[in-house]
Amino acid sequence: APSANRLREVLAQALPDLATLQRALNTILRAQTPRFVKKGKRAYYIAIDLTLIPYHGEPYADEKEIVRSQPKSGTTHFHGYATVSIVHDNQRFVVALRFVEKGESMEKIVAWLLNRLKSMGISIKRAYFDKGFCSVPVLKTLERRNIKFIMPIPVRGKSGGVRKLFEALASHKTRYTFNSPKHGELEVSAVVVKKYSKGRYKRKGARWFAYAVAGLPKSVAPHQVFEMYR
């Protein structure tokens, strides 16, 4: 049987270029947007997700289709796309899609998706982001646009960085400073959550989670942030 990559290669030959395909997909998504959303009478919770599909073959006709990221499934090469969804009554409605091309910044991707929402007349109550978007440029973009959000802070390396927040005895709220050699420093509000695994998370004991947040009511406790993000 042909491999998944081979099937994608065959299908790709029958598809239009990425820009044309993206426009077509977004036209379909817009047409399928629920009627209650189109009324534009309220703000919605939104989720912006990043999907990376492992790629083990040679790049297609356009090298820009292949992006690089942290190792996964034996490769650092991926096809990538980002989506923005409305979260309503425990359901998700994807309203826009953006392909990720080689060399594109997450800041550019996020700005495009937010602008797409604006063009559709959709207001944001709070945004939930994939951890793949956590960076100084993206956080600065959200700050400039005054968007309320919850975004996981990735844990990298074996020491330092966000791990310093895990030295406390319990869940807490604090401030955290991101340091980027290229984009400078940025201090954000952070929520740190300690969860006892009870056999989950593939390990015993406790596991820590950290989130960059903005616009949360003071009454919201750390464990509530964990549940809200789930």
Whereabouts are the PLM-identified features?
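An anionic, glycine-rich sequence signature occurring as long contiguous blocks
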Residues: R145-R230
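Alpha-helix initiation and N-capping motif
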Residues: A4, L18, Q22, S135, ...
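Active-site-proximal, Lys/Arg-enriched surface segment
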Residues: R8-H88
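Electropositive, glycine- and tryptophan-enriched low-complexity nucleic-acid-binding patches
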Residues: I66-S123, G205-L216
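Short, conserved catalytic/metal-binding motifs centered on acidic residues
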Residues: A1-S3, R42-H56, V84, I124-C134, ...
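Short, motif-level signal for alpha-helix interfacial/capping segments enriched in acidic residues
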Residues: A19-T33, E107-I109, Y211-Y229
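A generic local secondary-structure boundary/capping motif
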Residues: T33-V37, R68-G74, L139, T177-S180, ...
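Domain-level cores of phosphate- or acyl-group-handling catalytic modules
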Residues: G103-K164
